[in-house]
Regions:
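Alpha-helical transmembrane segments of multipass membrane proteins
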Residues: 38, 42, 109-114, 133-145
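Active-site proximal loops enriched in glycine and acidic residues that flank catalytic Cys/His/Asp
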Residues: 130-131, 147-148, 195, 200
Length: 248
C-alpha cells in the first residue's frame, strides 16, 4: 500500500508524464474510463463477468498446455500423469488452485440461481433487476476502496522511498461514515488498521484503532462530502510523489 511503482490502484492510474505523452483522443478515453458513472457497468463487469472470463480462458489455457505436454511426452516415449499435471499447473489467470475451485463452484451455483430465478419471474425481468442490484452494489464497494487510497494528500511513494508504515497510515484514509454504514461495510473504513496488519479481522478493526489512537495522528479522516473530489485524482506524479488531477 502506498507504493505506486508496484500497484496503481483499482483504476490502474498512469503517471502525469505518461498522460502528457498521450494524444488527445487517448487522454479523453483515459478520463472517460475513470469517470465515476462508469463504476456501474464497470462494477458489474468486475464482479460478474470478469471472473467467468478468467475461468474460461484458464480452462482453454489448461487444455492447450496439457495437449502440448502430452504430445511432447509421447514423442519421448512417456505417458503424461494427467492428475499430477492438472494439480501442479500454474494458471496465468489465477494465483492459487483454491481460487480456481472457488470461482468454478461459484459459477456453477450462479448458473443454477440464474436459471431458477429467470424461470420464476421471467428472464428479462430477472436480468434487469440483477444488473441494477449487482452493478449498484459493486459500484459502491469499488468507490469505497478507491477513496480509501485516492484522496488529497495520500501517501504516493515510489519503490525507493516507500515505507510500509507510512503507506498504511498515510496512504489509507479514515472514512467517516454513520454507524449503520460502518456496520454494512464491516468497519472497512478503518482501512489503515487493515493495512498495518491484514491478520486483524474486521470485527476487531475499530477496537485496534481506539486502542492505538495516540499512534495514529497522521491518519487522514475523509468525510462523505469530500468523496467527489477524490475521483479527480487519477494521475500519479512520480516526481513530487503525489496524486494529482489531469488538469495539472
Amino acid at each position: 500500500n502506498g507504493n505506486w511503482d508496484r500497484y496503481r490502484g483499482p483504476s490502474a492510474l498512469t503517471t502525469r508524464d505518461e498522460y502528457k505523452s498521450k494524444n488527445s483522443s487517448s487522454r479523453f478515453f483515459y478520463r472517460l474510463l475513470r469517470h465515476p458513472i462508469l463504476l456501474f457497468p464497470g462494477g458489474f463487469y468486475y464482479l460478474i463477468i470478469k471472473p467467468r472470463i478468467a475461468l474460461f480462458l484458464g480452462f482453454i489455457e489448461l487444455i492447450l498446455v496439457g495437449s502440448k505436454k502430452v504430445f511432447s511426452d509421447l514423442r519421448h516415449g512417456k505417458f503424461t500423469n494427467l492428475p499430477f499435471f492438472v494439480d501442479s499447473h500454474q494458471s496465468s489467470y489465477f494465483y492459487t488452485r483454491e481460487e480456481v475451485y472457488d470461482t468454478a463452484l461459484n459459477s456453477m451455483c450462479l448458473l443454477g440461481c440464474w436459471g431458477f430465478l429467470g424461470n420464476a419471474i421471467g428472464h428479462l425481468h430477472f436480468w434487469i433487476l440483477y444488473f441494477l442490484v449487482m452493478s449498484t452494489s459493486a459500484a459502491i464497494m469499488i468507490a469505497v476502496f478507491f477513496v480509501q487510497h485516492n484522496f488529497p494528500g495520500s501517501y504516493a511513494s515510489d519503490e525507493s522511498n516507500w515505507s510500509y508504515f507510512r503507506g498504511a497510515i498515510e496512504g489509507s484514509s479514515f472514512l467517516q461514515m454513520p454507524p449503520i454504514l460502518n456496520w454494512f461495510t464491516a468497519d472497512i473504513a478503518y482501512h489503515h488498521i487493515h493495512h498495518l496488519s491484514e491478520r486483524i479481522p474486521n470485527y476487531r478493526l475499530r477496537d485496534c484503532h481506539r486502542a492505538n489512537l495516540h499512534l495514529l495522528d497522521d491518519v487522514q479522516p475523509l468525510y462523505l462530502h469530500e468523496i467527489p473530489s477524490c475521483f479527480k485524482l487519477i494521475l500519479w506524479d512520480n516526481v513530487k510523489l503525489e496524486l494529482v488531477p489531469t488538469g495539472i
